[in-house]
Amino acid sequence: MGIDEPDIDPARFLEDVEMRVGTVRSAEPFPEARKDLYRLRVDFGTEIRQSAAGLTDRYDRDELVGSQVVAVVNLGTVTVAGFESECLVTGADDGDGGVVHLTTEREVPDGTRVY
């Protein structure tokens, strides 16, 4: 796997993409979705946002609740099977077809900006 994407201006990236750390407060099944997803409520300190996240292959709901995630919070709202997803929880392919969520090495305050 090579990295084939063109370079972008780093300052522009940091201006345009707002990533924040939040704590998962709830993770519910989402049987209405076409893919295996959870309905998450993520606490960003000043507000709670909801997200449709494809983390079902790697995490039980109990594992997610209380964990910190990194999410993109300025993509607008996307409706998934009638559910309004207000942020994108970031993740990485685990090499076995699952997704692991991105987090911080140490706990940080909810709402902390990621650079």
List each model region and its residues.
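Phosphate-backbone binding interfaces of nucleic-acid-interacting proteins
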Residues: 1-115
